[in-house]
């Protein structure tokens, strides 16, 4: 949230929802007896809400920290295949959306409904520039689910309804971190061989819905309704009310050429999907790879002011 010094800048609430998915968007003929998310679906259809699809690098049912990494840093797991940067590489201060906003006068907090130490988050969030971090140990939560799980739909409605009544400008960015991992029998009923999928089907299995909602009229120039973007491009501060870093401006230009860059494929400006073999890389993707190296590893020679 912004401090007094940044009055007029919006509160920015980011909700990364565990395994949030809409199977009806890619399983032809898939039906449920009742719609499990009528409120969210209706919200995403509203003209004043920007919604679309996030292409994710993480595997089905796992890889939350890698989705966080892409969103918060603007870097892509295309160059970290088989790795978990939170555990292996974030061993010093690293530019992120949190440090950018802190530099713009915001106070920043991360919250996660898991143990604080999971995926090395205590150290990583500090190195990303978060001022505070709360894990499951910091909440007075009844973990006895014998009475059933809380209803997500009710919580989403409560969140949006609350901020509709708040006078301060507020924007909510909502997305899923990865697809859920369902039973092998479920997938075998839809795909001949889950381990031998074409690029189009692979893309369908690695995407989640997103929406951007504000309690004021949002500018939709950065991401259009119906867009398909990878998470490294989704972590933009929307609406132009907060100054972007030169790196974010670079990413905005790169997204025009390659809207999706994940660990599995990238897309061209025309929507064509291309595998991630290095021989297929364009000059722009090679340049992006170099900038990621400069950001994460080459700290002694990090471009001054470029990432902040």
Named regions from a protein language model:
Residues 2-308:
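Solvent-exposed soluble domains appended to multi-pass membrane proteins
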């Amino acid at each position: 949230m912004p401090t007094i010094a940044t009055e007029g800048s919006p509160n920015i609430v980011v909700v990364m929802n565990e395994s949030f998915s809409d199977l009806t968007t890619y399983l032809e003929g898939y039906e449920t007896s009742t719609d499990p998310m009528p409120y969210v679906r209706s919200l995403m259809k509203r003209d004043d809400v920007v919604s679309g699809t996030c292409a994710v690098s993480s595997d089905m049912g796992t890889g939350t920290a890698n989705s966080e990494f892409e969103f918060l840093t603007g870097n892509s797991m295309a160059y970290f295949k088989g790795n978990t940067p939170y555990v292996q590489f974030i061993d010093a201060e690293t530019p992120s959306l949190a440090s950018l906003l802190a530099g713009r006068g915001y106070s920043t907090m991360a919250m996660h409904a898991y143990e604080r130490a999971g995926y090395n988050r205590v150290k990583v969030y500090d190195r990303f520039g978060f001022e505070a971090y709360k894990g499951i140990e910091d909440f007075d939560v009844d973990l006895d689910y014998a009475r059933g799980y809380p209803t997500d739909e009710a919580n989403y409605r409560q969140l949006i309804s609350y901020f509709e009544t708040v006078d301060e400008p507020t924007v909510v960015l909502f997305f899923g971190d990865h697809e859920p991992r369902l039973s092998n029998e479920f997938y075998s009923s839809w795909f001949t061989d889950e381990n031998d999928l074409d690029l189009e089907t692979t893309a369908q299995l690695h995407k989640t819905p997103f929406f951007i909602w504000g309690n004021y009229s949002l500018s939709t120039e950065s991401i259009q309704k119906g867009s398909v973007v990878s998470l490294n491009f989704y972590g933009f501060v929307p609406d132009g009310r907060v100054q972007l870093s030169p790196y974010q401006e670079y990413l905005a230009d790169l997204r025009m050429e390659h809207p999706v860059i994940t660990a599995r494929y990238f897309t061209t400006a025309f929507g064509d999907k291309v595998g991630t073999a290095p021989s297929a890389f364009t000059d722009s993707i090679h340049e992006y790879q170099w900038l990621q190296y400069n950001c994460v590893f080459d700290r002694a020679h990090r471009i001054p002011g470029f990432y902040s």
